[in-house]
Regions:
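Surface-exposed, interaction-prone regions used to assemble/regulate multi-protein complexes
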Residues: 1-105
Length: 105
């Protein structure tokens, strides 16, 4: 999925991390169609990133995977991008929703 740096938001006071992405709609027969979706992570206590130029809002990242691991009483959710870039979310509970917005193409 394609993500622009300026479409990644962490709202610390609400403990919400938002990611707007343009992705292939693989869950239907329209796999060649692109759709814009919002990926929302809730109950996020901390966010760390590496190899992402936050001062370049138009930089495009390619999300290639997500995984998580348990670290004591918390979880670390890893969002992995091409070029060895990643974002790590720390949370006590994993709660994620993916909401389709509209067709991109």
């Amino acid at each position: 999925a394609e993500v622009k740096v300026n479409e990644i938001k962490y709202i610390q006071k609400n403990k919400v991390f938002l990611l707007s992405l343009k992705r292939s709609k693989v869950e239907t027969e329209e796999q060649d169609k692109k759709i814009t979706s919002i990926c929302k992570f809730e109950f996020v206590d901390r966010v760390k990133s590496k190899n992402i130029k936050q001062n370049d809002p138009e930089e495009k990242l390619e999300l290639i995977g997500m995984d998580y691991l348990k670290n004591n009483d918390n979880y670390e959710i890893n969002l992995m991008f091409t070029n060895n870039a990643y974002i790590t979310l720390s949370t006590e509970i994993i709660e994620v929703t993916l909401d389709d917005q509209n067709k991109a193409d």
